[in-house]
UniProtKB/Swiss-Prot annotation:
Record key words, sorted: Amino-acid biosynthesis, Branched-chain amino acid biosynthesis, Cytoplasm, Leucine biosynthesis, Magnesium, Manganese, Metal-binding, NAD, Oxidoreductase
Cofactor binding description: Binds 1 Mg(2+) or Mn(2+) ion per subunit.
Pfam annotation, one family: Iso_dh
Gene (name only): leuB
Catalytically driven reaction(s): (2R,3S)-3-isopropylmalate + NAD(+) = 4-methyl-2-oxopentanoate + CO2 + NADH
Protein's UniProt name: 3-isopropylmalate dehydrogenase
Site (Important for catalysis) location in chain: 145, 195
Disulphide linkage map: none
Residues that bind Mg(2+): 227, 251, 255
GO terms, molecular function: 3-isopropylmalate dehydrogenase activity; magnesium ion binding; NAD binding
Keyword Cytoplasm included in the entry's annotation: yes
Length: 363
């Protein structure tokens, strides 16, 4: 008998509920085709939770997530709540506390240039023609954003500010293993990003990544300095499979990877802890300007579901089925408005229906 799984669904604000509806259509198709026993429960988060419960992350939402195998997250935020104190606004008051509560130390951001969408890539046509499929693995809880001491002191010409880059062995080991395990499900290559010619933290990073690599003889490892990596991503992104990055370097490179795909509406992300529990969400925002118009691109939310199936439920076949269905739809020229460029566009609902049907049919 197949295992029972439970997903906490947090649609959130803006286009979140609209695109989440499409992801759940696809989940229904997955359940039926693969005979998976998956249940869902919905919870308020972000602005919707502020309106209904007076806070962006109600205790009931946290409890619901604790009882789930994974969290499928929509998007939060909007002009309606911008007047609130920063720590009570939807983004800082919901998403960041969730990451902290569940000790989500790794962030996975796929960036793929889909066939037929080369015209949206800002790179030269000959570079875009080669395509690319990159997974950026970023460490989330260490590094210069959290290292101590940090602060400001002094005055006049002696006023100064300082931050500290700190990484512990265990932090590097666990994020490296995420990268190597991910590479085993892809094209078996990890490129570790550092600045080991200057930074002591990067020297330790490189040493430990080399140690972990011995556990994965089937995965090729390369090292690259961050400054060179930013250039190589523009020159030839097809050379990369998995990028392994510290918090700061991953913050930079994941956004660069996102930009060269040409559409934020296509980009999912996953944040994982050591137990495989994850929070899965689109990389884009709540897009209040198009909310309720049935024109939002739901693919990033649907791909976030695929990541959830792959990493938290260990259902790679189901994840691949979703990805194939999306590829098929795009190859057939099916586009939402953000990708149509004057051609006929389908609605949010129609795109969800098409992808769900293709999953069910096993295209």
């Amino acid at each position: 008998m197949s295992k029972n799984y439970h997903i906490a669904v947090l649609p959130g604000d803006g286009i979140g509920p609209e695109v989440m509806t499409q992801a759940l259509k696809v989940l229904d198709a997955v359940r039926n085709r693969f005979a998976m026993r998956i249940t869902t429960s919905h919870y308020d988060v972000g602005g919707a939770a502020i309106d209904n419960h007076g806070q962006p992350l109600p205790p009931a939402t946290v409890e619901g997530c604790e009882q789930a195998d994974a969290v499928l997250f929509g998007s939060v935020g909007g002009p309606k709540w911008e007047h609130l104190p920063p720590d009570q606004q939807p983004e800082r008051g919901a998403l960041l506390p969730l990451r902290k509560h569940f000790k989500l130390f790794s962030n996975l951001r796929p960036a793929k240039l889909y066939q037929g969408l080369e015209a949206f890539c800002p790179l030269r046509a000959d570079i875009a023609a080669n395509g690319f499929d990159i997974l950026c693995v970023r460490e989330l809880t260490g590094g210069i954003y959290f290292g101590q001491p940090k602060g400001r002191e002094g005055s006049g010409q002696y006023e100064k500010a300082f931050d500290t880059e700190v990484y512990h062995r265990f932090e590097i080991e666990r994020i490296a293993r995420i990268a190597f395990e991910s590479a085993r499900k892809r094209r078996h290559k990890v490129t570790s990003i550092d600045k080991a010619n200057v930074l002591q933290s990067s020297i330790l990073w490189r040493e430990i990544v080399n140690e972990i690599a011995t556990e994965y003889p089937d995965v090729e490892l390369a090292h690259m300095y961050i400054d060179n990596a930013t250039m190589q991503l523009i020159k030839d992104p097809s050379q990369f499979d998995v990028l392994l990055c510290s918090n700061l370097f991953g913050d930079i490179l994941s956004d660069e990877c996102a930009m060269i795909t040409g559409s934020m509406g296509m980009l999912p992300s996953a944040s994982l802890n050591e137990q495989g529990f994850g929070l899965y969400e689109p990389a884009g925002g709540s897009a209040p300007d198009i909310t309720g118009k049935n024109i939002a691109n739901p693919i990033a939310q649907i791909l976030s579901l695929a990541l959830l199936l792959r990493y938290s439920l260990d259902a790679d076949d189901a994840a691949c089925a979703i990805e194939r269905a999306i590829n098929r739809a795009l190859e057939e020229g099916i586009r939402t408005g953000d990708l149509a460029r004057g051609a006929a566009a389908v609605s949010t609902d129609e795109m969800g229906d098409i992808i769900a049907r293709y999953v069910a049919e096993g295209v």
